[in-house]
């Protein structure tokens, strides 16, 4: 079940960490935050935990969620390419 929060005409998805539970501990989130978002790892960890910048409830905007999806797809393709070279 996806948790959606509406705030100031923005829709935020707040349960992304749960949706990524099977890979959460395997990913270097610092690199994802820096390379794909241009943000700090703490920013991304807060987003994954459904916390906004002020400590309240928040999450990913639809645009940020699309960026995260693209980052994970890119990473999966790079892993597949590396495996094919073996």
Map each language-model feature to its residues.
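Recognition helix of helix-turn-helix/homeodomain-like DNA-binding domains
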Residues: 40-58
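Short, amphipathic alpha-helical "recognition" segments used to contact nucleic acids or chromatin
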Residues: 8-25
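Terminal non-globular linear segments
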Residues: 17, 21, 76, 80-85
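Short, charged recognition helix plus adjacent turn
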Residues: 6, 10, 52, 60, ...
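Alpha-helix C-capping/helix-to-loop hinge sites
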Residues: 23, 30, 51-55
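DNA major-groove recognition helix of helix-turn-helix/homeodomain DNA-binding modules
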Residues: 60-79
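Short alpha-helical "recognition helix" segments of helix-turn-helix
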Residues: 28-36
């Amino acid at each position: 079940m996806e948790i959606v929060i509406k705030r100031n005409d923005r829709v935020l998805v707040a349960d992304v960490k749960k949706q990524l539970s099977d890979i959460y501990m395997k990913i270097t989130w610092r690199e994802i935050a820096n390379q794909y978002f241009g943000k700090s790892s703490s920013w991304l960890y807060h987003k994954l935990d459904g916390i906004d910048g002020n400590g309240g409830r928040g999450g990913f905007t639809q645009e940020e969620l699309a960026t995260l999806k693209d980052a994970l797809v890119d990473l999966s393709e790079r892993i597949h390419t590396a495996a094919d070279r073996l």
